[in-house]
Swiss-Prot record:
Taxonomic superkingdom: Bacteria
Record Gene3D superfamilies: HesB-like domain (2.60.300.12)
Family in the record: Belongs to the HesB/IscA family.
GO cellular component: a single term: cytosol
One MF annotation (Gene Ontology) recorded for this entry: 2 iron, 2 sulfur cluster binding
Protein's name according to its UniProt entry: Uncharacterized protein bbp_116
GO term, biological process aspect, one: iron-sulfur cluster assembly
């Protein structure tokens, strides 16, 4: 039996500052894992890009304790899930889809985005 992993879209209440945003899409399994990681300690997730590899970037998620955001950050949220994004990276992170998948014995977050043009040969980085 196949089970389709439904998505929710996180939006920002700051849409008046940022025009034409698509939001951040997360699957139900990603939502469940993010809530598991953040609820107990009331942390939030910060999504960012890290320069690395042969192609240029990779996605990074980190837990942040300080919930006060500064003017250079935007919070996307829906259904008890919050993800913080730096405004300098918004044009590259807006529209990303986050999933939490099992590959062999390991579980990990997987990211997909229509703006990605190329992946490096090893698959560890990409370019827009």
């Amino acid at each position: 039996m196949t089970h389709k992993n439904s998505c929710i879209t996180l939006i920002s209440p700051q849409n008046n500052k940022i025009k034409n945003t698509q939001g951040i899409k997360i699957t139900s399994s990603a939502k469940k894992q993010i809530l598991f990681l953040t609820k107990k300690n009331k942390k939030k997730i910060k999504l960012r890009l890290k320069k690395t590899g042969c192609a240029g970037f990779k996605y990074c998620m980190e837990e942040v304790v300080d919930t006060s955001t500064n003017l250079s950050e935007i919070i996307f949220y829906a259904n008890d899930v919050s993800i913080i994004v730096n405004t300098n990276e918004l044009h590259m992170l807006d529209g990303v889809k986050i999933d939490f998948v099992k590959e062999g014995l390991n579980y990990s977050f997987k990211f997909s985005h229509t703006k990605i043009k190329n992946f490096c040969g090893c698959g560890n980085s990409f370019e827009f």
